[in-house]
């Protein structure tokens, strides 16, 4: 049902540089890296750019989930040879293993798990959940229909053009197009839209009955590559209402939007 990554060894992800204090503070938390890749086919491994990079921190006692987006253009040490590049190059070059190692090394974390999805998986999940309600600004509306057309073409999932700015009920493809928008502002604003779509979708999932949750799992899980097994997921899926999304933020907070190199 779920594409479990057999090449990903969790014990390799132990961060040797983490302080004892930090390790103590992280007890009782489950930290998972979420990668959204912009594949134009169904592939999710290396060779794809990670468009979405979110660190998901779950407090296993309280059920609070914190989401922190890493801006994909953040310059970090992306490999163990001190090579600095835009962070999404880590996933492109070395897949989830290199990306998780880079997050741990640069951000002083100990992430042992990850899940990677492509846009079709997100669109399918939101369609099963019945869509989400979003207020579109005029600038967002100006660009969204081009993204809808492109996302329909790359996923093969049907949708239609939106008619106006303001309150809109978005289907899966339209919600993905909204999360992908960036031409009229920055990656900072884009990651806020991504987290908004995750929050709205998660709220729908929490309210859904078990047959809907089961349908999401059956349709979406085969499209996800992950170090997490079904045994990890099923207890949480049966007890979804105890989880809630708390703080969400973008990293780094220092918002110097400097263009690097010719491509920017």
What does each of the following model-derived ranges do?
Residues 1-264:
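Non-catalytic, solvent-exposed segments at the cell envelope interface
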């Amino acid at each position: 049902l779920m594409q479990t990554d057999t090449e990903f060894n969790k014990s390799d992800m132990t961060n040797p540089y983490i302080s004892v204090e930090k390790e103590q503070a992280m007890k009782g938390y489950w930290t998972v890296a979420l990668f959204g890749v912009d594949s134009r086919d169904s592939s999710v491994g290396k060779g794809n750019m990670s468009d979405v990079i979110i660190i998901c921190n779950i407090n296993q006692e309280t059920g609070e989930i914190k989401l922190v987006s890493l801006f994909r253009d953040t310059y970090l040490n992306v490999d163990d040879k001190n090579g600095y590049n835009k962070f999404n190059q880590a996933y492109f070059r070395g897949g989830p293993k290199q990306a998780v190692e880079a997050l741990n090394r640069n951000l002083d974390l100990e992430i042992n798990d990850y899940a990677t999805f492509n846009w079709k998986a997100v669109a399918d999940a939101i369609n099963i959940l019945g869509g989400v309600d979003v207020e579109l600004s005029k600038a967002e509306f100006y660009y969204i229909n081009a993204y809808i057309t492109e996302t329909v073409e790359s996923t093969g999932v049907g949708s239609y053009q939106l008619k106006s700015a303001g309150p809109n009920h978005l289907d899966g493809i339209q919600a993905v197009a909204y999360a992908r928008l960036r031409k009229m502002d920055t990656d900072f604003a884009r990651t806020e839209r991504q987290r908004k779509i995750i929050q709205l979708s998660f709220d729908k999932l929490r309210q859904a009955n078990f047959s809907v949750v089961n349908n999401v799992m059956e349709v979406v899980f085969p499209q996800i590559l992950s170090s997490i097994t079904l045994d990890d997921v099923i207890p949480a899926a049966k007890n979804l209402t105890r989880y809630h999304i708390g703080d969400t933020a973008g990293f780094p907070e220092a918002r110097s939007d400097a263009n690097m190199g010719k491509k920017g």
